[in-house]
Amino acid sequence: MVQHLSAQEIIQYISDAKKSTPLKVYVNGHFENVTFPESFKVFGSEHSKVIFCEANEWKQFYQQNHSLITELEIEMDRRNSAIPLKDLTNTNARIEPGAFIREQAIIEDGAVVMMGATINIGAIVGEGTMIDMNATLGGRATTGKNVHVGAGAVLAGVIEPPSASPVVIEDNVLIGANAVILEGVRVGAGAIVAAGAIVTQDVPAGAVVAGTPAKVIKQTSEVQDSKREIVSALRKLNNE
């Protein structure tokens, strides 16, 4: 598995990060003689602009030029944000619209991240792993290869408190919808976690667990192959 960022490294990263409140400003007015700050990204025509800038910079600009503005609309989706979303340009995986993946998360080759899934800082999505709709990988949670994390499932994060151990999901594990894997739990290779299970202790390799708290109910060898199949076609990309 890929090496984790430590909790202290993540905490330091967040602490040191320049906090950002980016704005998207739609503005009409008389800007013929206006010089926009170099930090602004400005698009549009002479009398109608779209501006990308920081909130504090816009405030100063507006105070100096508000008399020239006839119409104004501002979009703001975060405040003093420390961690931007991950740049996915070089990510060799299938990422669907509406997935939230933060910087310093790792998405390995052939992974699939579905709509509404959230991957926090320091989390690792292993090769060929699928994170289904609205599932959450908390800080430093790790999956191995060819794992399926079902819709709405939660792998708890462990940035705070920093002493906690991260969730680790080994290769070829199936996690059912709305299951919760608590901090420090390790799920062994080939195991199955039933839908809605609350997993509070390590799961042995090849075991099937269910319930609240989750307990071993049988072995995966007793489960039909068709019910635990990982479908490679769902992970196929255009370059394959």
From Swiss-Prot:
Source domain of life is Bacteria
Q: Which InterPro entries match?
A: DapH, DapH_N, Hexapep, Hexapep_transf_CS, Trans_hexapeptide_repeat, Trimer_LpxA-like_sf
Enzyme Commission number(s) of this protein:
2.3.1.89
Catalysed reaction equations from the record = (S)-2,3,4,5-tetrahydrodipicolinate + acetyl-CoA + H2O = L-2-acetamido-6-oxoheptanedioate + CoA
Pfam families noted in UniProt: DapH_N, Hexapep_2
Q: In which pathway does it act?
A: Amino-acid biosynthesis; L-lysine biosynthesis via DAP pathway; LL-2,6-diaminopimelate from (S)-tetrahydrodipicolinate (acetylase route): step 1/3
Provide the GO biological process annotations: diaminopimelate biosynthetic process; lysine biosynthetic process via diaminopimelate
Keywords linked to the UniProt accession: Acyltransferase, Amino-acid biosynthesis, Diaminopimelate biosynthesis, Lysine biosynthesis, Repeat, Transferase
EC main group: transferase
The GO terms this record gives for MF are: tetrahydrodipicolinate N-acetyltransferase activity
HAMAP family in the cross-refs: DapH
Per its database record, what is this protein's job?
A: Catalyzes the transfer of an acetyl group from acetyl-CoA to tetrahydrodipicolinate.
Give the PANTHER family listed for this entry: 2,3,4,5-TETRAHYDROPYRIDINE-2,6-DICARBOXYLATE N-ACETYLTRANSFERASE, ACETYLTRANSFERASE
Similarity remark? Belongs to the transferase hexapeptide repeat family. DapH subfamily.
In Swiss-Prot or TrEMBL terms, this protein is called 2,3,4,5-tetrahydropyridine-2,6-dicarboxylate N-acetyltransferase
Which species is this UniProt entry from?
Answer: Staphylococcus epidermidis (strain ATCC 12228 / FDA PCI 1200)
